[in-house]
Amino acid sequence: MARIAGINIPENKHTLIALTAIYGIGKKRSKFICSIANIPEHSKIVDLNEEQIDLLRTHVAKYVIEGDLRRERTLNIKRLIDLSCYRGLRHRRSLPVHGQRTKTNARTCKGPRKPIKK
């Protein structure tokens, strides 16, 4: 398996799809990386030579990915909670942050129903 950014990339998949195994790289960014590196999107990782894989590594390294991206996201949420702004309070209470209704929906955020005690 080819290792890019510390992640084992599946070799039997097309380059476009294989790069999406890296957290922080979706299809759009993967397509952009392939076009910059002049690598066909539909060629499989097995068919690429070492130079092309090194080229992919250098282009992927330019982005904030994997652990750094996860850390950045958690620090952003922690910052909102520490500020006690509206979005931070919603995060703290595990409620929807972007103004969605909560009377009937939002079961995923709220968690399972709590029984009413009589």
Curated annotation (Swiss-Prot):
GO molecular function: rRNA binding; structural constituent of ribosome; tRNA binding
Matching InterPro entries: Rbsml_uS13_C (IPR027437), Ribosomal_uS13 (IPR001892), Ribosomal_uS13-like_H2TH (IPR010979), Ribosomal_uS13_bac-type (IPR019980), Ribosomal_uS13_CS (IPR018269)
S-S bonds: none
PROSITE patterns given in the database record: RIBOSOMAL_S13_1, RIBOSOMAL_S13_2
Pfam families in alphabetical order: Ribosomal_S13
Keyword RNA-binding attached: yes
Region ranges (Disordered): 94-118
One cellular component (GO) term of this entry: cytosol
GO biological process: translation
Keywords of this entry: Ribonucleoprotein, Ribosomal protein, RNA-binding, rRNA-binding, tRNA-binding
NCBIfam families in alphabetical order: uS13_bact
Assembly and oligomerization: Part of the 30S ribosomal subunit. Forms a loose heterodimer with protein S19. Forms two bridges to the 50S subunit in the 70S ribosome.
Record's function text: Located at the top of the head of the 30S subunit, it contacts several helices of the 16S rRNA. In the 70S ribosome it contacts the 23S rRNA (bridge B1a) and protein L5 of the 50S subunit (bridge B1b), connecting the 2 subunits; these bridges are implicated in subunit movement. Contacts the tRNAs in the A and P-sites.
Sequence similarity: Belongs to the universal ribosomal protein uS13 family.
Protein name: Small ribosomal subunit protein uS13
Originating species: Buchnera aphidicola subsp. Acyrthosiphon pisum (strain APS)
Gene expressing this chain: rpsM
